[in-house]
Each structure stands twice: as structure tokens, then as C-alpha cells.
């Protein structure tokens, strides 16, 4: 399987064509709403990037590339679970990644507490479940894996198994 992660900021048409031709899964970082994304991911000149990233996702999808949206859940994202779900649900495949503090023990402006992450997951799961019951299913990797495990199936996420194979990182 070929997979790559990108911030989605500057992908050329040639690179997108390559991903399509070689059947890559592309994970694109989009941290919720434009407001929450732009807070942590401005460009080098300090300008917002959410609209550029959203256009890149559309270009990838139009080319037939499989796309997962990767959303880092920090303290700001965690305050807006419903808005974040609504912003990302149209992309259908979402991975939420908690933003943990470093090992230095320093708390930062964007730090995510365990309580805030739990509240985010609970409200997001309610939205996920509602979308499913209304016939608008969205794949949220953690939820999909936890449900599979509760049903006695193994998770597809190797981290939830406790062992991952080697990956080439460039």
C-alpha cells in the first residue's frame, strides 16, 4: 500500500496525477474549521491556509485519489466538536489525532487536557452516530476501530493492536 501525509498546501498537478496513477492514499492535514486550522497552520508569511488545503483536497478527489482528512485535536479544536464535525464530515474519512504536550512537561496555549479531549470525543461520537442513523455515514478511524473491537473484531489500526510493522518515512 502506498500512502503519504501532506499539509496540502502546495501540491502540483503532476504530483496529484502521480498519486492517482500509483493508487496512493493521501492523508491531508485539515484541523477542523477554517478558524481552528488557520490558528495553528498559517503559511510562512502568516496568512491563512485552510482554503488552499480545502481546494487541494477537492483536486485530489477529482483526480480519483483516496483522501483521509487528518485533524489534530488541540485545545482550540476540542472547544468546537460540532463545528469541527460539520466542517469535516463532507470529506467522509477522518482521523482525529490528539495533540499531546511534549515530554518537557510544559503546557502551551493550545494544550489539550484529558477532560477536553474526552468531551470532544463524546460530542463528536454523538454527531457520528446521528449521521449514521440518518443515512449519512462518516468514517472516523478511532470510532470505527473501537466499534469493531466491541463487536469482537480486530482493529485495522495497528496502534490499537499494540504492534505496527515497519514504515518507510522520507
Name every feature range the model reports, one short phrase each.
Residues 1-36, 43-55, 71-83:
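Canonical radical SAM enzyme core domain
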Residues 39-51, 58, 62-170:
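Radical SAM enzyme [4Fe-4S]-AdoMet core and its adjacent flexible, acidic
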